[in-house]
Amino acid sequence: MLYYFIIGIPFLLVILRLVLTNILVPHFKKKQQKNQLSQRSDWSNIENKTRILEALYKKDHAKYSSVRYRLLHLIQDKEFVYGEIDFLSFYTLLERTCPSTQDVFYDLGSGSGKGVFSALLFFNVKKSIGIELLPPLYKQSNTRLEKATQRFQQHDVEQEYLPQMERIQFINDSFLHYDFGDADIIYVAATCLSDPTWNELISKMAGLKPGSRIIVTTRMIHHEQFETVYQGIELMSWGLCPVRIYKIKH
């Protein structure tokens, strides 16, 4: 009996680690973040917009759609592993970039569009654009846009958001091919990107106008054109993740 207990210890430790890193730590991080934001004078506005976003994505099957498409098309490249933002964490990240109503936001690999909607609803940016290569995710993004438009048409208290929907755009393409040169703020979930893809993307982003801000998960940018303005650990759908914000130098 003791033998089975001893050999089972490593397995139990692995389970404990998974519970801590994927459930308990993210739970307390989210709770702490909410407590901090709730002390602010604009919390009711943030909370209301978060509720709208959560309602829009209440029955979201983006991860399933991504996995199904990759299986059907025998895509094994880990670059297409699906992950999503947490709305409140993304709000705090975007806020660090000091977004204005004149900024153009891009989400490179936008999935079902959560980042795109968040940037527009939270900060009323000039344009919010998502570039997504996988057709089912691109399709779901546009379905969400239609759903949001219908919701804002039907709810009098939310009709102020209706004109904003015209400033959302989803593009079915590779972010390495599409011209996002008008970007002021970029978000890229670089966690699973391959080295060749990441290096090519860095070279492309280095040509952005001075002052442009880039939010990056996991990976680092070592390039003379980029200045680090923030680094920390933030909550994502897959757990806690290193995030950095860079600025294009003048």
Walk through the language-model features, giving the residues of each.
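S-adenosyl-L-methionine
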Residues: Y3-T101, Q140-F180
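Conserved SAM-binding loop of SAM-dependent methyltransferases across substrates and taxa
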Residues: K114-V125
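Conserved short alpha-helix immediately C-terminal to the canonical SAM/SAH-binding motif I
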Residues: G115, P136-L137
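Conserved SAM-binding motif I beta-strand of class I
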Residues: K127-E132
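A short SAM/SAH-binding and catalytic strip from SAM-dependent methyltransferases
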Residues: D184-P196
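C-terminal substrate-binding/active-site "lid" region of AdoMet-derived donor-dependent transferases
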Residues: L193-H250
